[in-house]
UniProtKB/Swiss-Prot annotation:
It is found in: Cytoplasm; Nucleus. Coiled coil: none annotated. Gene3D superfamilies: DPH Zinc finger. Residues 4-60 form the DPH-type MB domain. The gene is Dph3. Widely expressed with highest levels in heart, liver, kidney and testis. PROSITE patterns: DPH_MB. SUPFAM superfamilies: CSL zinc finger. This is Diphthamide biosynthesis protein 3. It catalyses: [3Fe-4S](1+)-[protein] + Fe(2+)-[Dph3] = [3Fe-4S](0)-[protein] + Fe(3+)-[Dph3]; 2 [3Fe-4S](0)-[protein] + 2 Fe(2+)-[Dph3] + NADH = 2 [4Fe-4S](1+)-[protein] + 2 [Dph3] + NAD(+) + H(+).
């Protein structure tokens, strides 16, 4: 069983469209990373390439199965329908 450093909502990650990768700052100074493809495949663990820490990504798996990108948080409370 993995020991997670933290559990982080996908909305708190930064998304890079070019690499289709979500990033979140790691305490070591690098970034945790998880690709959109990983999320579409049901993965929920983001790793840091510079240290041994891992975090659990909290996200709606159904939304990623529809091939959608989760936008940054906004004030719009309207639900997205698949």
């Amino acid at each position: 069983m993995a020991v997670f450093h933290d559990e982080v909502e996908i909305e708190d990650f930064q998304y890079d469209e070019d690499s289709e990768t979500y990033f979140y700052p790691c305490p070591c100074g690098d970034n945790f990373a998880i690709t959109k493809e990983d999320l579409e495949n049901g993965e929920d663990v983001a790793t840091c390439p510079s240290c041994s820490l891992i975090i659990k990504v909290i996200y709606d798996k159904d939304q990623f199965m529809c091939g959608e990108t989760v936008p940054a948080p906004s004030t719009n409370k309207e639900l997205v329908k698949c």
